[in-house]
Amino acid sequence: MAGHLVKYGKHRTRRSYARIKEVLDLPNLIEIQSDSYQWFLDEGLREMFNDIMPIEDFAGKLSLEFVDYQLLEPKYTVDEAREHEANYSAPLHVTLRLTNHETGEIKSQDVFFGDFPLMTEQGTFIINGAERVIVSQLVRSPGVYYNLDTDKNNRKIWGTTVIPNRGAWLEYETDAKEISYVRIDRTRKIPMTELVRALGFGSDEEIIDIFGGSDSLDFTLDKDVHKNPEDSRVAESLKDIYERLRPGEPKTADSSRSLLTARFFDPKRYDMAPVGRYKVNKKLSLKTRLLGQTLAETLADPDTGEVIAQKGEMVNKDVMKKLAVFLDRPDFKMVTYQPSEEAVVTEPMTIQVIKVQDPNDPERTLNMIGNGNIDAKLKHITPADIIASMNYFFLLQDGIGSTDDIDHLGNRRIRSVGELLQNQFRIGLSRMERVVRERMSIQDAETVTPQQLINIRPVVAATKEFFGSSQLSQFMDQTNPLGELSHKRRLSALGPGGLTRDRAGYEVRDVHYTHYGRMCPIETPEGPNIGLINNLASYGKINRYGFIETPYRRVSWEDHKVTDRIDYLTADEEDQFVIAQANSPLNDDGSFADDVVMARHESDNIETSIENVDYMDVSPKQVVAVATACIPFLENDDSNRALMGANMQRQAVPLVDPHSPLIGTGIEYKAAHDSGVALLCQHAGVVEYVDAREVRVRRDDGALDTYKLMKFRRSNGGKNYNQRPIVRVNDKVDADEVLADGPSMEQGELALGQNPLIAFMTWQGYNFEDAIAINERLVRDDVYTSIHIEEYESEARDTKLGPEEMTREIPNIGEDALRNLDQDGIVRVGAEVEDGDILVGKVTPKGVTELSAEERLLHAIFGEKAREVRDTSLRVPHGGGGIVQDVKIFTRENGDELSPGVNMMVRVYIAQKRKLQVGDKMAGRHGNKGTVSVVIPQEDMPYMPDGTPIDIMLSPMGVPSRMNIGQVLELHLGMAARNLGIHMTTPVFDGAQDKDIWEAVAEAGMDSDAKSVLYDGRTGEPFEQRVAVGVMHYMKLAHMVDDKIHARSIGPYSLVTQQPLGGKAQFGGQRFGEMEVWALEAYGAAYTLQEILTYKSDDVVGRVKTYEAIVKGEPIPRPGVPESFRVLVKELQALGLDMKVLGGDDQEVELRDMDEEDDDVVNVDALSKYAEKQNEKTNASAEEAKAPSTESAPVETKNNQN
């Protein structure tokens, strides 16, 4: 028997078919969120305050310094914040020190900086009572990038971009004549040498001395001539640059100097961030650039004079090993140049210069310039960086160096929560800085305190805006635990500072070889966001620079054995190594079993000797994300279908009694454990008490821990989040063990669906085109039943005419409709309600005249309802019926915070139990989705020889063209597992082989083809062919027909066109569009067409009269003019076109406005005005009083129109 037993948690043992031993456990799956936020609290905040502070006033008298900060206790707990629709946040207090330089007086003070949102243990934020996730952003890393294009004549165009984190871009480019230009901040281009001159190297000789020979440089110097003899070359260049940056302004050398200093050399305006400095130093360092080049000078040890490398020697890895030590020294081959006094930066510039041979012409020597090991703490760019980057640009044209691939993950980095928050907070602080400066100059320096200078509004506004409305702050997907986990691990290339959907081409979206082990090549949305939204691979981590790292096992260079040492490599580090696959066969001592192995190097898959191998993958599943790693037999599925499978697992609805898959992949336990919905034990101990609401654990040190379970809570997606204990009294529990299953969990494992008996067969054409025929048992036994909870809210406000009132006494409502309401008009918990039932009775005062003193007295004594009120009760919307699960009442008296003008708020939760029905969407894990087309009685279902009826019938046509064969393998192995009564694990890329499956089939006593004879439930006859029958994990998805079905007779209309609104959410109608009109015209259905275009749509008067006629039983009147036609006429009139409507006799037809009255044409407003006039006319005759009896009709249609 193949396979071995593996225990997942304490409650589930599976037979695993994995062959590769796990050398590294999966990391905590939400650490991308929690670690980043922790960094922000520990370092990020402090770093930002230190950046902005000290703030000095314009005269330099006062300065405000940052001392320290602390977060106090949060005002609400997580649950209270949810309940009160508040933020889960803590007050931030900052200690500031104000120094008066004239008197030497120092004042320290603690200043409140607003409430700062805290991250929950699950990696989410609670903002206004809703759980939100800050998605990590994938952006282009700051650094220097080189690229090569061709123009229309196939000539090479070289380009360079120096990208900072904040500040002006610097771009170099060549034209068809090989002249090099520079652009500053996307302005017009100027010859590159002008920028060099502005840096203080004015003469051509100096420039040639620095850069050495280069064709492009010579052409550029020829182009850049001295135009104005009155100015020195440096001053002239400064003025030229100023003219490009500020066209039309008077140009002087001084203003240009200060402008360039501000653009590039002021740390407040230009920030490379540590990652930018790291990338620039790495790209321009001679350590990487000298490899593979031939030296044009002899290099010696500056101390001893010993030769390190001879002239004419090629620098290979061995030479570089000796050289590297010296290249890091501050005195090795360093050259210092003194810029002119007029330059932008007048400090001496030190660069590292080594002469190398031109690869195309060995006689010619080239200068290779490094930026001289600039300190990693330096945030802005330096003249040495600019000179070295230009030198790289020139050498690139001579064939030395390499261009950069912008989609390489060494050039894209992750901005996680902490950094995004920091950037947002910085914006708030810099706005505050301006205010502080102004206040410093206004207020009296003697008496002012830090508190008086600080205005925290901009800081609070910036964080509020970020959490509330940033594209990266998203309402958490809480359909099931896997959806939550995936959302927290999502990487988006969209958002502020990122890409936009329309501008992103194919290259950005495509899978890149550096995604291996870093980003999942499978899990990404279908549609316009494909490839822009990705997921972190299962073992991926993010380093301090924001690059994604993935772990590899080190292969010893001496004896070529795989060691236990694990190294995390970024994409550009990995490019230097050869990496063997995780499934390369190994001997027991760690040596490779074969002399030649499959390996990866850069973008190639190669067969190579084991002497060349540097590393080995840690696990086959390190390539994919968590959701993808949940698909068994992933290796047998087409990638497009696997993508759908991974995405649809996130949409599985939590069922009432879920079961974890019989055929798992071994990641189910870890995914459920880290998702945040399971109840985890904090400290080891023994369980003392268990019930449905709490678990108590006696710790080993004697203390008692009480854990409250989450019961029937509404999740973000309206699903039911509920926890069930899985431990018993006297169980010994360890720290971090699962005490209670959350939604979609069973025995501590992820359980997104059920394991029904499935046959691939057709049945009466009911499973045509991905339709699914199901057994009535699945409905009757609540196999796929789920609970959905919806929340409804009603507020009693103060209006101009008096306060609204929650009450049971609602005008014109019978006692029957009030049977479930208490004395305050609020529905009781447990009541069964249907569409249209009242949940909260509420009345709003109507406009009435002031009561006389007598009426007021009567009202006070008898409490008569003398006042006119309107019924504004909260009712159950269409399709919202169910059982009232909970009612929460918030009032000011109870100390609840309500928004201004609100006196009382009632929140009602209604739970629905939804059984599986025709129209619901279901899916397996291999992208095999369909909708339920028929529910067949159990006795009519095909049954197996032992009498077991099939649960689900799928169309066999759904397999071959889709190429997701994984479902067939799962089916067979699942049947074997069911017969053997065990659970199995078949990890991705390392699972059961076909021989393992056939062995399991034989062991389970099944037929050798793994098929079965099936009998027709209606006739008892066997079917002609044997049928593949087995067990597959099958899920019900969140796309349920109950949420989609919709009907309308009368309802709301659009204000301008008076046509019905569209969509279920607006209770809209079906649009009868242009093509549908053609269809009716083709059939000559004139009256149907007329009704559709008038009464049923926007003939305002006709609607009302038709309704009236139906109520009174009179013949339906002729239609009037559709309102949209009038809108069209008005629009044409607005263009100055006189538009008239002519009747059949060429006489003009009068188009009345909606609100004009007429005896024939009656609209709702006219009807109510008419009724009022009748009351006023006391001397009116009886006939007039009886006119159009409009009591019942207008009320309803009036509501419909508003």
Curated annotation (Swiss-Prot):
One of its GO terms (cellular component) is DNA-directed RNA polymerase complex. Residues 1151-1202 are annotated as: Disordered. Residues 1189-1202 have a biased composition (Polar residues). GO terms for biological process: DNA-templated transcription. Residues 1151-1162 have a biased composition (Acidic residues). InterPro entries: DNA-dir_RNA_pol_bsu_ext_1_sf, DNA-dir_RNA_pol_bsu_external_1, DNA-dir_RNA_pol_su2, DNA-dir_RNAP_su2_dom, DNA-dir_RNAP_su2_hyb_sf, RNA_pol_bsu_bac, RNA_pol_bsu_CS, RNA_pol_bsu_protrusion. It comes from the Bacteria. It catalyses: RNA(n) + a ribonucleoside 5'-triphosphate = RNA(n+1) + diphosphate. Its EC number is 2.7.7.6. GO terms for molecular function: DNA binding; DNA-directed RNA polymerase activity; ribonucleoside binding. Keywords: DNA-directed RNA polymerase, Nucleotidyltransferase, Transcription, Transferase. HAMAP family: RNApol_bact_RpoB. Belongs to the RNA polymerase beta chain family. The RNAP catalytic core consists of 2 alpha, 1 beta, 1 beta' and 1 omega subunit. When a sigma factor is associated with the core the holoenzyme is formed, which can initiate transcription. DNA-dependent RNA polymerase catalyzes the transcription of DNA into RNA using the four ribonucleoside triphosphates as substrates. This is DNA-directed RNA polymerase subunit beta. It comes from Pediococcus pentosaceus (strain ATCC 25745 / CCUG 21536 / LMG 10740 / 183-1w).
